[in-house]
């Protein structure tokens, strides 16, 4: 569907690439498909835990954290498959954003922890951050200021 929207209407699409529900190999197949379809903008997310789980559990050898998925995308961009072999075609030009939480992620002990992980995501290559739904604008503006103070200089 994303390819149809992008190619027919010339609208840039940003598919969500999740840790949840996918193994590393399945993620690689998705990246290959997106590369073939010339879709290069991604939103990289861990995804939610299953309703019956008390903690997030990855699929098979899938990832626990979005930053691990970022590493796979970064390697893919360099022409390296998940098994370590090199692509015989041109490497991918994926760019991506990540999630952030102005009102604190439900699993985080505090907002400082969320800022720490956001900074790690930025250091790993995130170009922008998209907030999860929030209800208090004041907390959003405080979060943006705290992010800037922590050296996080991407659009939020």
Language-model segments: which ranges?
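Active-site-adjacent beta->alpha loops and helix N-cap segments on the catalytic face
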Residues: 1-4, 23-29, 49-72, 76-88, ...
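Flavin-dependent oxidoreductase catalytic cores
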Residues: 1-14, 94, 109, 117
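Active-site mouth loops of central-metabolism enzymes
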Residues: 13-25, 95-113
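Hydrophobic faces of well-ordered beta-strands that scaffold small-molecule active sites
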Residues: 13-17, 42-44, 96-100, 122, ...
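Hydrophobic or amphipathic alpha-helical targeting/insertion segments
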Residues: 31-49
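Conserved, mostly hydrophobic/aromatic
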Residues: 34, 121, 125
């Amino acid at each position: 569907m994303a390819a149809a929207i992008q190619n027919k209407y010339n609208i840039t699409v940003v598919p969500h690439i999740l840790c949840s529900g996918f193994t590393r190999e399945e993620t690689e197949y998705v990246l290959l498909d997106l590369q073939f379809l010339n879709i290069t903008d991604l939103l990289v997310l861990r995804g939610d835990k299953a309703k019956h789980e008390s903690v997030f559990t990855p699929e098979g050898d899938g990832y626990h954290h979005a930053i691990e998925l970022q590493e796979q995308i970064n390697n893919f961009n360099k022409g390296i498959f998940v098994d370590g072999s090199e692509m015989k075609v041109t490497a991918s030009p994926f760019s991506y954003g990540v999630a952030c939480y102005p009102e604190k992620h439900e699993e985080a002990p505090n907002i400082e922890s969320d800022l720490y992980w956001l900074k790690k995501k930025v250091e790993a290559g995130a170009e922008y951050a998209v907030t999860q739904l929030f209800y208090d604008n004041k907390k959003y503006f405080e979060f943006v200021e705290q992010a800037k103070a922590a050296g996080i200089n991407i659009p939020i």
